[in-house]
Amino acid sequence: MSEEETHNAPIAPEAQPEEINASCRGPVLFLFFSAAVWAVQATGVGLLGSLKMHVPGFLADCPFLTYGRLQANAWVAFLYGFAGNAGLGLTLWMLSRLRGMPLAKPGFVLAGAFLWNAGVTAAMVGITMGDQPGMAGYELPAYASR
C-alpha cells in the first residue's frame, strides 16, 4: 500500500455509546462485582488480623489464623482481588469507549476474569495453608502465580 492509499483509507464507523456499553456491560459488571466482593473479604481478613495483633490469645488454637497468614491474605485480597479486578474493569470500559467500537468477544474477557479470580482464590487458600514463600510483598504460592 502506498502512502497516498493509506491516508485515504476509509475510517471504521464509530458505534453508538449505547452499543459500546451494551457490548462490555457483562464483563465490566462482573469485574466490578468481583472487586467489591474482594474488598469486603480483604477488610474482614484485615480486621481479623488486627484483632490477632492486639489480642494474641484470640483463636490461638487455630494454626491457620496466625497474624502473618492473615496479613498476607489481606494484602493479596486487596491488591490482586480488589485492585486487579477494578483496574481491569475500568480499563476495559475506557478502552472500549475511547476506541469507539464495541467489545468484540466479551466471552473471552469473562473467561479471563474467572481465571483471574480462581488464581487469587488459589493464592489465598495456599497462603492460609502455609504455602507462601518468605518474600514480603510477594506472598503468592508458586502454583497460583505461574
Describe each model-derived feature in a short phrase:
Residues M1-G26, G57-C62:
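Extramembrane terminal tails and long inter-domain/linker segments of multi-pass membrane proteins
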Residues A136-R146:
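Non-cytosolic membrane-interface motifs at loop->transmembrane helix junctions
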